[in-house]
C-alpha cells in the first residue's frame, strides 16, 4: 500500500518489534514514522568496532541499539519455547521476502545467521520507506506529551516536537530510560520476574561428541545443540539462546557495565559453542525488595552488571573465561 498521505502512527524503536509494527501499519493503511535512537546498520558497525577494539561503549549505538535492535547482531534464531506465540508463519514469510533463506519456513529450529541479518533488516527499512513510511535514526524519545491522561505527542532528542495520537513503544529490553519516563508520566509499571545468569562456552567438538554419541565431525550432521533444565533449591535453572558454532560478544549499553550475548553465523562453523545458563528470579527474592518499588528488578540487574565490570578490570572483558 502507498501510505505517504495516510493517518500517522509513531513507532519508537527499529528493532524486530518496531519493524514488524511498521509493516503491519502499512498493511492497515497507516503511515508509520519510526524513531530509532541508534544508527543504521552501516554506521552502527563503526561503534561495534570501537567496543571490540577499544572497549568504548556508545550508549546510543551498540550491540543493542541501532537499526534492527539487538536482533541485527544476535544470531537470527527464530525458535521460541513460548506457548503464547500464536501463528508465526506470517513473520517468517516476511523474513524470506526480505532475503532470508526459505529453509526457515520448514526447519524445526529456524535460523538466519548473524552474517545475513543486516541485509534483511536493511531491506525491511527500504520497503517501509518505499511505501511512504519514514525511518529516522539518531532519534531518541525523550518525552511524552500527555494531557488529561491522553497522549498528544512526543519529544525527540530534547528538541523536536511531534503531534501523535498513537505511539507504539517497541523499545526492547535495554532501554531502561523508557521505564523511568513512563513512571514519571504516571503510567503504572511494576517489577516482573526475569532470568539472570552466565554464558557458558564449550568446544563444539565436545558438544558434538556428547549429543551424537561419539560423532564429532560427521559432514552429514549439523553442529549439535543442547537444552538443559534443572530445579536447584526450588528455582528453575535452564539453558537459553544456545549457539552451536558461535561466538560470545559484549552487549553492554553503558560503559560501566558488562553484559554478554551469543550468536552464530549461518553455517554455525566456529569451533566453539555457547549458551546462556540462567536462573528464574522473582522480584520478591531480591535483597532490596519492596512491593511498591517498580524498579527493584532493574536496579538489581544494574548492580550485577556493574559488579561484573569491576571484576573484569573495569573493561568490556568478561570477569572469567
Listing of model-derived features with the role each one plays in the protein:
Residues 1-94, 98-321:
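Residues forming the flavin
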Amino acid at each position: 500500500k502507498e501510505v505517504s498521505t495516510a493517518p500517522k502512527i509513531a513507532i519508537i524503536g527499529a528493532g524486530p518489534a518496531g519493524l514488524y509494527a511498521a509493516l503491519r501499519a502499512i498493511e492497515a493503511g497507516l503511515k508509520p514514522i519510526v524513531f530509532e535512537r541508534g544508527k543504521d546498520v552501516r554506521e552502527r558497525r563503526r561503534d561495534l568496532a570501537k567496543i571490540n577494539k577499544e572497549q568504548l561503549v556508545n550508549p546510543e549505538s551498540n550491540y543493542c541499539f541501532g537499526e534492527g535492535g539487538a536482533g541485527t547482531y544476535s544470531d537470527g534464531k527464530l525458535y521460541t519455547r513460548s506457548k503464547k506465540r500464536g501463528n508465526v508463519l506470517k513473520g517468517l514469510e516476511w523474513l524470506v521476502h526480505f532475503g532470508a533463506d526459505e529453509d526457515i519456513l520448514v526447519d524445526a529450529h529456524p535460523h538466519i545467521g548473524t552474517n545475513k541479518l543486516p541485509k534483511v533488516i536493511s531491506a525491511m527499512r527500504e520497503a517501509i520507506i518505499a511505501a511512504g513510511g519514514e525511518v529516522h535514526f539518531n532519534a531518541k524519545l525523550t518525552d511524552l506529551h500527555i494531557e488529561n491522561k491522553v497522549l498528544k505527542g512526543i519529544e525527540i532528542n530534547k528538541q523536536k516536537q511531534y503531534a501523535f495520537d498513537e505511539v507504539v513503544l517497541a523499545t526492547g529490553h535495554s532501554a531502561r530510560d523508557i521505564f523511568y519516563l513512563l513512571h514519571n508520566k504516571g503510567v503504572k509499571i511494576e517489577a516482573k520476574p526475569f532470568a539472570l545468569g552466565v554464558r557458558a562456552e564449550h568446544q563444539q567438538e565436545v558438544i558434538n561428541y556428547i549429543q551424537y554419541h561419539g560423532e564429532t565431525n560427521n559432514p552429514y550432521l549439523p553442529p549439535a545443540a543442547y537444552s538443559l533444565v534443572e530445579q536447584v533449591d526450588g528455582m528453575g535453572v535452564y539453558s537459553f539462546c544456545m549457539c552451536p558454532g558461535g561466538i560470545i560478544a559484549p552487549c553492554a549499553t553503558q560503559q560501566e557495565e558488562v553484559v554478554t550475548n551469543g550468536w552464530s553465523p549461518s553455517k554455525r562453523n566456529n569451533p566453539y559453542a555457547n549458551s546462556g545458563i540462567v536462573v528464574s528470579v522473582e522480584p520478591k527474592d531480591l535483597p532490596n525488595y519492596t512491593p511498591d518499588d517498580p524498579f527493584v528488578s532493574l536496579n538489581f540487574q544494574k548492580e550485577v552488571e556493574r559488579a561484573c565490570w569491576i571484576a573484569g578490570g573495569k573493561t568490556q572483558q568478561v570477569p572469567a573465561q
